[in-house]
């Protein structure tokens, strides 16, 4: 089967790799986003998909706006591909492109459709505290993730999973599911299922303001935000930004999901039942563990943080390095 692959980030690499390892498929070309400039050094950096394609001597096309790039459109048409495979490409494909391949354009989407259509399904799924997510393959149409569904695969989400953890798992699942989907499409063993638009939810592009932590929210809500938008959630500490990259909401309801090393750590904590403070206030510090902050509902353990210009560090190293004291308040420009 002749394939053209459209994809850009690390999430798309395992699917391309699975196609390249399978002799049933011939990847004719790879379409990816233009190289981007890094913040540091201002160097142009190729996408992970481009790196993989170059390593396998594949033609790579990087149109700025594929809808209006006549040269790319002509080259795609001339390839006469059986299917286009699209995994987190980052541009909307025109109907002209969608109509080119014989079997259609197959998209690998990081959610259980019709839930979490859109640009950031994994992040918003974690933000909302979902306990399961998955991959859906679908035949693309002109809408945003509205095409008929082909196959689905699910995976559980643990309370300590962050967006990177889930993305890595789903990227592998997606590669396997895509191969199965293409086989069954070719053999006409799949009946595409239209999505129920009434049941659809949307995962919009994440904005900078989504990273700000509001300490009046509950410990569980803040924890879900921190792991969903990992590693970018930010508060303030002594009038400078502080990223919180890992946390844990304290309470018996969550303890069953703890790995042994975290269970041992929490056994060092004092009785917290009588401790309280204002939202964002550091209410307890335990040697070898770190700081605990009051939230609008419940207490939040700061497991890992990152100061400006520094590497991420454990909660306890943060306490030691800054000489943090009980009573200091996070947020509110403090």
Curated annotation (Swiss-Prot):
It is an enzyme of class 2 (transferase). GO terms for molecular function: methionyl-tRNA formyltransferase activity. GO terms for cellular component: cytosol. It comes from Trichormus variabilis (strain ATCC 29413 / PCC 7937). Attaches a formyl group to the free amino group of methionyl-tRNA(fMet). The formyl group appears to play a dual role in the initiator identity of N-formylmethionyl-tRNA by promoting its recognition by IF2 and preventing the misappropriation of this tRNA by the elongation apparatus. Disulfide bonds: none annotated. Keywords: Protein biosynthesis, Transferase. PROSITE patterns: GART. This is Methionyl-tRNA formyltransferase. Its EC number is 2.1.2.9. It catalyses: L-methionyl-tRNA(fMet) + (6R)-10-formyltetrahydrofolate = N-formyl-L-methionyl-tRNA(fMet) + (6S)-5,6,7,8-tetrahydrofolate + H(+). It comes from the Bacteria.
